[in-house]
Amino acid sequence: GVEAEKAMHRIYHLRSQLMPYIYSSVRQCHTDMLPLNRGMYIEYPDEEKAYQYPGQFLFGDLLLGAPITSKGEGEKKIATQEVWLPGGTDWYNFFTGERQEGGQVIKTKSPLEQFPLFIKGGCPLPMQPYTERMCSTPLTELIVRCYPGKEGANNTYILYEDDGLTQDYLQGKYATTRLNYQKSGGQTIITVSPVEGTYEGQPRKRAYRIELPGIPVQARVSVNGKKARTTPNQELNGVIVPIKVMDIHKPIVIKIQ
């Protein structure tokens, strides 16, 4: 019905927003011979529970999905699902922002428009605004979403880009951007390194939006040493740091205290 159609549209939009991450993950599949949807036992071969939950999988390096296959109950079609969250990191519900410690099995409850989708804490996730032409539209605004990491976290994700149309990447025509998250001594540093590499149609400049779930409005935030304007966001339960259009070859360093 109408509710199911709305739920489908929301997930379709999410796919578009996640395309920088998905595209980078597919590149990793190409270079490292890994599947995009990975059984838990691929990353955690020594964990007994990795073999006990075949219905869930890692979607690239950062996301964990557990599709619901049971009927939802009640007016909101709430469905329950057991999910195993591997240890060594905190996991955040992508839709609600709720934090869960790793190393446990939890029981989730999801309405029709959601499903159990979790992201590792302390890892930069590249995203983009919704666009219908999600692969070939130039990335003129890069969204970097970072859920809080544990003390001592130091994680890097490599954003991959090419023209999205040809096989010129086989001749080395592509670009990468290092996204790094560090947390130490009560300070969080997020770094967007200069873009390396070129390809046809590559944008020379882009805007940025740093999304910080779980960060309070009163937090002190700076961008390249200057105090930054932050915007509270209720859906994220955190703040957004908008960064105006910049040359892609200039670094961006965001500090949060």
Model-derived regions: residue spans:
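Surface-exposed interaction regions enriched in Ser/Thr/Asp/Glu
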Residues: 244-257
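Catalytic core of carbohydrate-active enzymes
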Residues: 1-189, 195-219, 249
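Extracellular/luminal ectodomains and secreted, surface-exposed scaffolds of diverse proteins
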Residues: 224-247
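Generic structural motif
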Residues: 177-183, 219-223, 230-233, 256
